[in-house]
Amino acid sequence: MSQKDLSKTIPYGDLGIIPLESSKAIGKKVDDYIVGWRNEADVDSSIHFTNYKRDSYIIDAVCPRFGSGEAKGILNESVRGKDVYLLVDVCNHSLAYTVCGQVNHMSPDDHFQDLKRMIAAISGKARRITVIMPFLYESRQHKRSSRESLDCALALQELTAIGVDNIITFDAHDPRVQNAIPLKSFETVQPTYQFIKALLKNVPDIHMKPENMMIISPDEGAMGRAIYFGNVAGVDVGTFYKRRDYTKIVEGRNPIIAHEFLGADVSGKDVVVIDDMIPPVKA
């Protein structure tokens, strides 16, 4: 929304931003941007815009841990009536805590538990709660194969059950997981423009022409993304498909016996590999 339209829109509530420990740096950047953007806005001085312009929208909140490794969420200021946004990076493994004298790096499960603790401290007080989770927790476990748990669906239902109104993520592994919470807001933002912009900026000699470049999907799961990028760039698309031995099961999966390539000749071309998710080594 442009700044000239702000006077026609009443804020849902006083803005509050809670970047969890995993997202402190990006949270500060978001806060600085909003402070600058709002200071330039021409809004009236009515009661609807009270506290609209402030020096910071970040709410003082922490998740300290006990010696046992357990934790609790603490708000050091009121969030009553606020429109609260929580930022969390469940893949930030740089954070660590001590349990019985041993150092443990935080896993996605740890980050998700801290998120729920903070929501529990907020629920019933904030006017609206929105979770911004760039990497959707448990997104790779979006469907059931045999006797498996549906972790991503359960995680989304947990969040909405304890008071979350909106969930925002980026390029969800499978956006259809939002069917788990059909009556709640779930947004998966596609950063296609940012991806292409970064590619052209960091690889200045790349040429988006069919004779110079090709998009390749490593498997069928990423084919939709590869086709989209190929159409945007105006280049050819290729893919691999996995031949599996369905007579055996190794580590819970049918083993791959070969990768077959389907596509045009890649000789002399710049190849951009588009995958839906890049796990260690496997793809």
Predicted regions and their residues:
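PRPP-associated nucleotide enzymes
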Residues: 1-283
